[in-house]
């Protein structure tokens, strides 16, 4: 099966990595809207338009399924995209909620949602979690992580300063952290290390990763099984510099 993966830039590599490892598909077309990243600071109308333009990009490629790897687009553009599409389109929020349901049985467990400003303001995660009965949900817009990750700053003083700025004021320490932006799994170990080092938690918080969550979701919903004989072919496209995007992919995905 040939599918598409759409993201605002390189953040979708975290989803792509999980898809490649799972080997559920024969061919993957990756489109990063890198000329207009970040999405998280833009208004809902603009994000919806970007989503519809992404659909136009994928039409000639004749894909059978589209994965919206961007949380902001999943929160604000997914429904509009589905209305204008003849193929299934899957976002990353519903799979993450399914992963929570499967792994977190305590409805009072403190859950922290990290995301871009646009994703957090949409309340998509908060509303979905409350519909499932989770009562102790907080959220935090951590948009500055995105440009750091886009610049391949995955460790060091700048990232540490950014984490300190966002996390120091927290009043309730989470047992579960939803990485509500597909960029964030690229610094997941640093986030976990910060919480363990600065808050002396007895156990590491459970990190919900969009990529792993979506693989489980696809296997369950579409009865997909691993193709043991072939590694998926990947083709990269970008609204910006595709050579740069391919270079980042080789570094991060070890292609």
Curated annotation (Swiss-Prot):
Protein name, as recorded: Glutamate racemase
Family membership: Belongs to the aspartate/glutamate racemases family.
Isomerase as UniProt keyword: yes
Protein species of origin: Helicobacter pylori (strain P12)
Enzyme class per UniProt: isomerase
Record keywords, A-Z: Cell shape, Cell wall biogenesis/degradation, Isomerase, Peptidoglycan synthesis
Keyword Repeat: no
PROSITE patterns reported in the protein's UniProt record: ASP_GLU_RACEMASE_1 (PS00923), ASP_GLU_RACEMASE_2 (PS00924)
Involved pathway(s): Cell wall biogenesis; peptidoglycan biosynthesis
GO biological process, one term: regulation of cell shape
GO MF term set: glutamate racemase activity
Domain of life: Bacteria
InterPro entries: Asp/Glu/hydantoin_racemase, Asp/Glu_race, Asp/Glu_racemase_AS_1, Asp/Glu_racemase_AS_2, Glu_race
Active site positions, chain numbering: 70, 181
Function of the molecule: Provides the (R)-glutamate required for cell wall biosynthesis.
């Amino acid at each position: 099966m040939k599918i598409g993966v759409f993201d605002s830039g390189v953040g979708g590599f975290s989803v792509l990595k999980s898809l490649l490892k799972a080997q559920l598909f024969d061919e993957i077309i990756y489109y990063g809207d890198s000329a207009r990243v970040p999405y998280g600071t833009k208004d809902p109308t603009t994000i919806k338009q970007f989503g519809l333009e992404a659909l136009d990009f994928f039409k000639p490629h004749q894909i059978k399924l589209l994965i919206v790897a961007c949380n902001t687009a999943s929160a604000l553009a997914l429904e509009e995209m589905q209305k204008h599409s003849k193929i299934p389109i899957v976002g990353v929020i519903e799979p993450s909620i399914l992963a929570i349901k499967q792994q977190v049985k305590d409805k009072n467990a403190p859950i922290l949602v990290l995301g871009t400003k646009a994703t957090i303001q949409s309340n998509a995660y908060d509303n979905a979690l409350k519909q499932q009965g989770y009562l102790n949900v907080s959220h935090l817009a951590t948009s500055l992580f995105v440009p750091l990750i886009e610049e391949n700053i995955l460790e060091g003083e700048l990232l540490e300063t950014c984490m300190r700025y966002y996390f120091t004021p927290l009043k309730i320490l989470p047992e579960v952290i939803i990485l509500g932006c597909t960029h964030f799994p690229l610094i997941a170990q640093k986030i976990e290390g910060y919480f363990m080092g600065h808050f002396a938690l007895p156990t590491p918080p459970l990190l919900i990763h969009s990529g792993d969550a979506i693989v489980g979701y696809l296997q369950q919903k579409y009865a997909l099984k691993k193709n043991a004989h072939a590694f998926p072919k990947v083709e990269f496209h970008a609204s910006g510099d595709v050579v740069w995007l391919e270079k980042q992919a080789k570094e991060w995905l070890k292609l």
